[in-house]
Amino acid sequence: MLDYTEAGTILHSLMIVEHTVSNNGSFSAIRMRRMRRDEFSRRLMRENHLRVDDLIYPMFVIEGENQREAVPSMPGIERVSIDQLLIEAGQCVQLGIPAIALFPVAGEAKKSDDAAEAYNPDGLAQRAVRALKQSHPDLGVITDVALDPFTSHGQDGLIDDTGYVLNDETVDVLVKQALSHAEAGADIVAPSDMMDGRIGAIREALEAGGFIHTRILAYSAKYASLS
């Protein structure tokens, strides 16, 4: 049976042959279309293979019970209450989707200048995470670490009297938010803000809090997602 080492050697040889210069005339023998001609060679040469294992399902959660709201800018996507969230999460498990990305939609009454609701242990995101991990413990839960859902002004950070976003003060709140997610059971926290130094601060706080297995997802790895 052909092992992976031998298969890799053969594939490498194919690539070398494709880069050989032809002696028949002046036209180069580098014709990349050759390897795209047949299905078998396209399969051998393709860089990416999208499978269910590669999927993360975005879910937007709102307060209430038995609530579903369409998101006009994303046809087919809905904001759902926690009870409906659990139903959809169960469908994700049945389909083999390994993880969901959770985005809370806070009501206006929950928003403030200091975004304190972001790290409320009984906040919407935190309750949703606990419910998900209790109902579907093997489903990965990724949470969004950002303040814009919770600030009255809509900025992704704390601001001063001139509207300038305060970096270090914002990082302190982001750390509290990430810790509250980890305490609720989040497997991965994903900071989507743009504050300098927040990754190191979050990692340090997670380690100090004993959440050594909580991972941090860079949004640079998430650029092609729906969310």
Predicted regions mapped to residue ranges:
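Intrinsic disorder/low-structure terminal segments
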Residues: M1, T9-I10, S26, K222, ...
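Alpha/beta enzyme core
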Residues: N66-E69, V80-S227
